[in-house]
Amino acid sequence: MGDFVISGTGGWDWFSIQLDNNTELMLYVLRDRAGATSALFGSFIMPDGTVQDIGPGSARAESTGQWLSPHTGATYPSGWLVELPEQQLVLTVTPQLQDQELYFPGAVFAGPTYWEGAVDVHVSGAGSPTGVGYVELTGYAPPVPSSQ
């Protein structure tokens, strides 16, 4: 994924979700420099291992809140509503902890600053599955300068 940052996109939001009904979702939302979604794609994996491709127009991920980093001053999305119409799923994705930002102040190799962490997932509807996952957010904060 690092090539996306080098090639000039604004960053990405990456979701890896495992539901307790043994289905999984991998979703990538790429953003342009202005912050608009430039691409959205991924895979939905059924319990039998069958993979359903998620392409343009077949999913939506919308932020439901924000978190302001006390470390870098960056504002990150915090909480999401993910809609998968073909799978008839609406997922509410919530960070298990707000402060999961990775930054490297004073490091020889500073690298990009990003947010990545554990999330809880709830599916809309009575008796619907719940799950857990992992979200990675890049492009919301400038890199921390290295010490060299």
For each predicted feature, which ranges?
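Structured soluble/peripheral alpha/beta segments that form catalytic or ligand/cofactor-binding pockets
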Residues: M1-Q148
